[in-house]
């Protein structure tokens, strides 16, 4: 994998930094594992904007990813690594011994030709998925389940990982990248290693149009709007003279947004700011 800085042949290329991975498949994706993905423009069924700054962008197909890793005790060979427009991580197409193909998140260090396996008796090896009761304390894992059988929900983006720091009774304690420490049932499945493509954070798009290709529209500051459009709008100069709020008047910048008291007991330590 290489980090390439483009030559300044135009204003739009001047600051571009690309991530080039020669291992990625250059052809089309595996058609049986594709699904349609329709654009909403951030609108709901009434046509009202429910998510701002979304619209346009290139057409995409959704890749059906196996987050559950529930094909147990059947070895699979990695056929190829692929780009996925729906996520920052790359994906791997694997062929199981019984002939079935699936997409999985591509961990760091996994290459075409490698063998992976899921199940309680799988060896501790990058790309293998096991219940966390069978994974040694101190191991680095990704694609971690919060509920047994539901599929991985934690540490799925490029370069993400979680460390198992303790095992006590039916629970393991995880340290997340944010600094949060939380308990998860030891029966939950996790995949060994960290998610690949960690250089994703180093890329520079270089121009506004590159964000538009991705379906991301401009974000306008409230203080640049009129009073009718935003609580920060209007006035002389740039100072809006009040506590910062959202366009709907809800306090922001530091306001707590978590409301799930039911799972508070599983959080051993809050994330660091």
UniProtKB/Swiss-Prot annotation:
Keyword DNA damage: no
Pfam families: Ribosomal_L2, Ribosomal_L2_C
Gene Ontology cellular component annotations, sorted alphabetically: large ribosomal subunit
An example Gene Ontology biological process: cytoplasmic translation
SMART domains: Ribosomal_L2, Ribosomal_L2_C
Ranges in a coiled coil: none
Compositionally biased intervals (Basic residues): 253-273
Protein keywords: Ribonucleoprotein, Ribosomal protein, RNA-binding, rRNA-binding
Gene3D superfamilies membership: 2.30.30.30, Nucleic acid-binding proteins, Ribosomal protein L2, domain 3
Keyword Ribonucleoprotein recorded: yes
Chain residue ranges for the region called Disordered: 30-50, 221-273
Entries under HAMAP family matching the protein: Ribosomal_uL2_B
Similarity field: Belongs to the universal ribosomal protein uL2 family.
Subunit structure and binding partners: Part of the 50S ribosomal subunit. Forms a bridge to the 30S subunit in the 70S ribosome.
Function as written in the Swiss-Prot or TrEMBL entry: One of the primary rRNA binding proteins. Required for association of the 30S and 50S subunits to form the 70S ribosome, for tRNA binding and peptide bond formation. It has been suggested to have peptidyltransferase activity; this is somewhat controversial. Makes several contacts with the 16S rRNA in the 70S ribosome.
Protein name: Large ribosomal subunit protein uL2
